[in-house]
């Protein structure tokens, strides 16, 4: 006899590229950064250096627009061997500031899904990683905040983080559902805890969130092509 799946006591949504577009804004800014620094390398080289600086500094600055701004400045210093001027750095800073206040428009299906889950009385949470001020601002600008009973902004999404969240809210893994676009951050650590994970693919994907296919072998998670399909899965 199959044991029925318990009703979720907590349904968490990732924010960036799940509730609203985020990566396209960063990609657009990176294209402009490459153009500004074109005298110091080709596009592939500059993009690679920018990501390497970000990755190297993640333990110091974490994720988000401010970290990206610092990476732009450090990359410019490296590519110019320290010769970059304040006049040349200012456009980079201006680009970074745009990432802190771009308009937030919910992705297709988001309002429909949140409205229906709220009607059903489901307990909803935003669970996102990044800079506290930046992510709080995005939630506010999105107009979606009233759908969520809880907002959790964390510095990293791994098994330890999810376990802390479950413990804090008194929820067992089988009573928790995580919905997000990142296999690395939203799916793998949740599935490894024995909780339910729903993958909603989004493109483009930041290189840092890519997962080799072999890491997915044997991992139990559910994939939907559009967010509205989660309403059927969670019925």
Give residue spans per PLM region.
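Short amphipathic alpha-helical segments at helix boundaries and their inter-helical linkers
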Residues: 58-67, 100-108, 161-164, 189-196
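Active-site neighborhood of HAD-like aspartate-dependent phosphohydrolases
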Residues: 2-49
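Asp-based, Mg2+/Mn2+-dependent phosphohydrolase catalytic module
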Residues: 1-8, 111, 115-119, 131-235
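An amphipathic alpha-helix signature
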Residues: 26-34, 69, 73, 132
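Short helix-capping segments at alpha-helix termini
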Residues: 39-43, 81-83, 143-146, 170
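A metal-dependent, Asp-based hydrolase signature
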Residues: 48-98
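Short, acidic loop-to-helix structural element flanking the phosphoryl-transfer center
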Residues: 7, 65-67, 86-125, 159
């Amino acid at each position: 006899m199959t044991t029925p799946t318990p009703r979720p006591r907590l349904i968490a949504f990732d924010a960036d590229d799940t509730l609203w577009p985020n990566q396209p804004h960063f990609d657009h800014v990176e294209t402009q950064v490459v153009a500004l620094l074109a005298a110091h390398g080709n596009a592939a080289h500059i993009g690679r250096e920018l990501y390497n600086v970000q990755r190297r500094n993640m333990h110091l600055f974490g994720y988000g627009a401010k970290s990206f701004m610092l990476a732009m400045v450090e990359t410019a210093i490296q590519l110019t061997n320290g010769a970059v001027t304040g006049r040349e750095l200012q456009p980079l800073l201006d680009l970074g500031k745009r990432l802190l206040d771009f308009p937030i428009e919910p992705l297709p299906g988001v309002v429909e899904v949140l409205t229906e889950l709220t009607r059903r009385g489901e307990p909803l949470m935003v669970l996102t990683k990044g800079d506290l001020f930046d992510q709080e601002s995005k939630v506010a600008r999105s107009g979606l905040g009233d759908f969520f009973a809880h907002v959790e902004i964390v510095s990293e999404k791994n098994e330890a983080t999810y376990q802390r969240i479950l413990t804090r809210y008194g929820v067992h893994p089988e009573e928790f559902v995580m919905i997000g676009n990142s296999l690395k951050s939203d799916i793998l650590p949740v599935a490894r805890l024995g909780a339910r994970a729903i993958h909603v693919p989004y493109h483009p994907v930041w290189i840092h969130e890519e997962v080799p296919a072999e890491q997915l072998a044997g991992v139990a998670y559910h994939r939907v092509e559009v967010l509205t399909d989660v309403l059927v899965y969670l019925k």
